[in-house]
């Protein structure tokens, strides 16, 4: 037990130190980025049909996700590439979606004054699908070409199940959906940042308690937690900088990959309930509007405005009220997700870690 406790303390201490380092580094990069973005007028355009209270945000610096992505990239490369395959995958997905989001942000900043978007929705969707497909293959293929998950998933009351090749299309849809869901949620100051902090924190705990222990993935999650927490320093109401597609798409896709790597992706709708509900509200609103326009000749709406946070704004809630209440929901959801992982996860048989050179203690002996 002394060996077990020593390794657990060492792993958690390493993860928390990376979180603290990420917080400090992101604060430094963030201060520089806010000044740089203001100097070069990298200000966000606000949709004219949105809530009128948002018009005061016109010109607020955007693409703030660069401070999170760059911090995670630097610290992971320096301190958390022990098991290269398991870390290169979330890093690769993060960078790929960040580049896509950065180009989209840049096009929206430099395009026609009458437009607020960069890429067309269809073009961006197919690029995201392509990157997600490559990531899903990397998860499914055997080593050394992939991580050899072979479609494994933890199902409550059932245990570990191999869903075979079905894993690939499911993983693609999860990555694309969660990436867009986070992007949709990023419409109020600190709303996406807070819920990303909670979600990555939850998966950090889940991977720490997993069998075998996914210690590198845990350290990665807490690195993102520290970076997101520091981003909130600049994104708290009233925001000095917005995350932009650069950050929202990248962090959403990375969260999905982390969930898939942990084999606890069925818990993602629970842990990321705010993201899921925000995305579904937009899909329901759009679908219902199109159907009623076809059926009755005029489009009708279920919500006052989509996504859902705008609906509550138009009901009279202030922006801080919407954010705080959604964050409270996200906090409870994260706790429920961790509890479900503990209840329905595989039984602990001893100590296993994914780092080479560590003693492994199992139920049938040690090696």
From Swiss-Prot:
GO terms for molecular function: metal ion binding; phospho-N-acetylmuramoyl-pentapeptide-transferase activity; phosphotransferase activity, for other substituted phosphate groups; UDP-N-acetylmuramoyl-L-alanyl-D-glutamyl-meso-2,6-diaminopimelyl-D-alanyl-D-alanine:undecaprenyl-phosphate transferase activity. The gene is mraY. It catalyses: UDP-N-acetyl-alpha-D-muramoyl-L-alanyl-gamma-D-glutamyl-meso-2,6-diaminopimeloyl-D-alanyl-D-alanine + di-trans,octa-cis-undecaprenyl phosphate = di-trans,octa-cis-undecaprenyl diphospho-N-acetyl-alpha-D-muramoyl-L-alanyl-D-glutamyl-meso-2,6-diaminopimeloyl-D-alanyl-D-alanine + UMP. Its EC number is 2.7.8.13. The chain crosses the membrane at residues 16-36, 62-82, 87-107, 125-145, 158-178, 190-210, 214-234, 240-260, 264-284, 326-346. Pathway: Cell wall biogenesis; peptidoglycan biosynthesis. Its cofactor is Mg(2+). It is found in: Cell membrane. It comes from the Bacteria. It is an enzyme of class 2 (transferase). This is Phospho-N-acetylmuramoyl-pentapeptide-transferase. The keyword Cell division applies. GO terms for biological process: cell division; cell wall macromolecule biosynthetic process; cell wall organization; peptidoglycan biosynthetic process; regulation of cell shape. It is a multi-pass membrane protein. Its main location: membrane. One of its GO terms (cellular component) is plasma membrane. Catalyzes the initial step of the lipid cycle reactions in the biosynthesis of the cell wall peptidoglycan: transfers peptidoglycan precursor phospho-MurNAc-pentapeptide from UDP-MurNAc-pentapeptide onto the lipid carrier undecaprenyl phosphate, yielding undecaprenyl-pyrophosphoryl-MurNAc-pentapeptide, known as lipid I. It comes from Chloroflexus aurantiacus (strain ATCC 29366 / DSM 635 / J-10-fl). The keyword Protein transport does not apply.
